Structure formats: C-alpha cells, structure tokens
C-alpha cells in the first residue's frame, strides 16, 4: 500500500476538498483570524512539475506536494483548497493575503526567509533537459554557451541559470540565450517545438519527462538547495511545523519522500523567518 492510499487524495483548484476536518470532534489548530478563509487552508500551487505537482487527465491536482498539503490540512483540522497560479505571483499574493501557504516547492533563500516564515522539508537540485538523443552533446554547463535555454520566470531556477550564465561569460564564452516562460509546461513545450535547445527544471520533473521518453536529461544535480513551505502567518507556520514533526515521528513523512525518490529530512523541522 502506497502513501497515497494512506493520505488524502488530491483535489481541484478553488474547490474545498472533503476531509477529516469536517468530522465531529476535530478542532482546528489555527484560529480563523490567521486564515484567509475560516476553517480552510488555502494553498497556492503551480501544477506544471510532474510528479511533484501536476493536473491529471481528469483535471485533478496530483503529486507529492498536493498529497503533503492535504495531509497537513487534515492534521490541522482544516479543509484544503488550492489556487493554481504562476510562480511569479505567489510571493506577492501571499503578502497580499490571497492564500495562506505557498505549496509549490519554493526554494529557500536567505532573502526569502527575511520576508516570510519558511519551513525547509525537502532538498532539490536542477536539471537541464534536451531533445531525445542529446544531439548537441551537452555534457557540462559550459556547453550551454550561446544556446537558447528555457526556464520558468521568476524562480530559483531562473536565478541560478543567470548565475551560471555570468560564470560562463567570465570564462570568455558566449552568454546563454535565456528565454523565460510563465511556467515549466510552456518551457518544455518550447523545447519540443524547437524554440529552445534546452530547458531547466528541478531534478524530479526532468527525470519524469525522461522516463516518459519525451526528452533526455543532459545534466542534473546542479545547485542542490533546500525547498520549503512558505506562510505569512507566524501562528500558522508554528502549527504546520508541529504537523511535520508529528509526520516525522509516525513515519508518514519519510514514506512520502521515499515514494517519490526524495531524501527525507533526518532532523527536526523548524521555522525560519523574520525575527525567528
């Protein structure tokens, strides 16, 4: 039996999902005053990163992060609700109070931790996908010199690609022709259409596309960095970190990470944020 059968099934955007939060005797662990919507945990996600978060053929949200978000909501006695939105709008939307939690695999940075409470729960690195057969023989980052490379706008991946570009230029090579897209799905569509010669995404997504036979993964394991959940409310972040530590103790967190081939966090979870 997989962890998916043990935890809540994924749901639809802007649709509250039936959950144990509605059962008698389940008292919400977070006050309504700390939430965008009473009794509800509203989460933003960009479901263009299979198998971590994606939309299946029935239009339903699926993936590791959706399963995790649903389980967190369940243990908080709240109803999970998702807002599908591009990553570039997520931090401004959180600060504006449009959702309670960013659940899209946001990379932790010191700059972001100064803006909002964050809980590191996963480690991720970056891959470079290319056309089948790797016709350009890309085997090292310098091979991207002078080539059009697609990436999602506004994320950690774009930042690291631009840092890589500076490193390449400093070596006297031609700059990478960086092309930004609203999300990873459109970036991969551009690679498929020949508009770019490579696409940058997190390791599991590039591996999934390779497994499907769509693209090859030329490079992987670049810039390993913690991935986090991000919240606006300090009380909510404290409640969420308590849930994650409970999941650590009962083994459900480790089971979920291992199901997706991810390395689980071995230590206790903690909140990193302004004044924390």
What are these regions (language model features)?
Residues 70, 74, 79-143:
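Acidic, polar ligand-binding/catalytic clefts
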Residues 88-92, 105-114, 160-167, 190-223:
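A ligand-binding cleft/hinge motif common to bilobed small-molecule-binding domains
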Residues 42, 78-79, 96-104, 147-148, ...:
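Alpha-to-beta junction loops
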Residues 22-26, 30-31, 156-176, 218, ...:
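Ligand-binding clefts/hinges and TM-proximal coupling segments of bilobed small-molecule sensing domains
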Residues 3, 9-11, 21-70, 74-79, ...:
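N-terminal hydrophobic or amphipathic helices and topogenic motifs
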Residues 42-50, 61-74, 106, 127-182, ...:
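Bilobed "Venus flytrap"/periplasmic-binding protein-like clamshell domains
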Residues 66-75, 134-135, 142-143, 147-155, ...:
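Extended ligand-binding regions for polar small-molecule ligands
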Residues 47, 123-130, 204-245, 262-276:
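Periplasmic-binding protein-like
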């Amino acid at each position: 039996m997989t962890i998916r059968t043990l935890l809540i099934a994924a749901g639809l955007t802007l649709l509250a999902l039936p959950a144990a939060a509605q059962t008698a005797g389940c008292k919400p662990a977070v006050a309504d005053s700390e939430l965008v919507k009473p009794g509800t945990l509203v989460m933003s996600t960009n479901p263009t990163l299979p198998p971590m978060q994606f939309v299946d053929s029935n239009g339903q949200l699926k993936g590791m992060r959706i399963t995790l978000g649903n389980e967190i909501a369940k243990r908080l006695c709240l109803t999970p609700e998702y807002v599908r939105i591009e990553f570039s709008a997520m931090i401004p939307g959180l600060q504006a109070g449009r959702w309670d939690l960013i659940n899209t695999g946001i990379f932790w940075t010191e700059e972001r931790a100064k803006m909002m409470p964050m809980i590191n729960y996963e480690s991720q690195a970056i891959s470079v996908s290319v056309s089948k057969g790797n016709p350009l023989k890309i085997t090292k980052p310098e091979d991207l010199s002078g080539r059009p490379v697609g990436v999602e706008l506004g994320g950690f991946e774009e930042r690291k690609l631009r840092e890589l570009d500076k490193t390449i230029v400093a070596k006297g090579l031609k700059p990478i022709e960086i092309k930004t897209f609203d999300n990873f799905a459109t970036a991969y569509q551009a690679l498929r259409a020949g508009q770019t010669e490579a696409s940058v995404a997190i390791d599991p997504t590039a591996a999934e596309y390779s497994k499907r036979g769509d693209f090859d993964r030329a490079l992987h394991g670049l810039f390993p960095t913690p991935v986090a959940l991000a919240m606006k409310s300090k009380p909510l972040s404290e409640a969420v970190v308590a849930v994650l530590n409970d999941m650590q103790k009962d083994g459900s967190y480790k089971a979920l990470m291992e199901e997706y081939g991810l390395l689980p966090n071995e230590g206790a979870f903690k909140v990193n944020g302004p004044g924390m």
